[in-house]
Amino acid sequence: MTEVADGSISFDHVDFSYTDENGDKTHVLKDITLDIKSGEVIGILGGTGSGKSSLVQLIPRLYDVEAGHVKVAGHDVKDYDLDSLRKQVAMVLQTNVLFSGTIKENMRWGNKQATDEEIIEACKIAQADEFIQEFKDGYDTKIERGGANVSGGQRQRLCIARALLMNPKILILDDSTSAVDTKTDSLIASRFRIKS
């Protein structure tokens, strides 16, 4: 199956474990059942090591469930062509990667055909446009390897904007605003609520 109809997600009695090099299992998720409607903005809260990242990584099949089912648009994720599924599930992690090149070129890794207007709009939603405009060369500012010339919070916002340009059915932000201040985090969240 190649077409992902919408962004609805359901976890149906999902169990997940990691197996270490000795073959010992560490149970991370047990009997998780959850339904998320397409367009819904939710937060998953829990302490460090509680399985939040593991849970969301089951959606694009970075891992597979041990028991139960993860469904997207009503179909088990295992029924989708893996590449097609992953093109419709954008993930922005706490640790983000920027590439050498301009900001605009980095944004086009999310969508090669993105117009300048689409790039600016995505950056506005991600609260990146303001700091980009402060650079002498704006969107033509060169990014050093790994994004060494921007702060951690700026790097996170650029990666969120790049993910938005993919126009995915599902956008997962996994601790991806950890390096931004509370005000900026709230602004990003409010822009997502407006967009959805």
Task: Name each region found by the language model.
Residues 2-196:
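ABC-type nucleotide-binding domain
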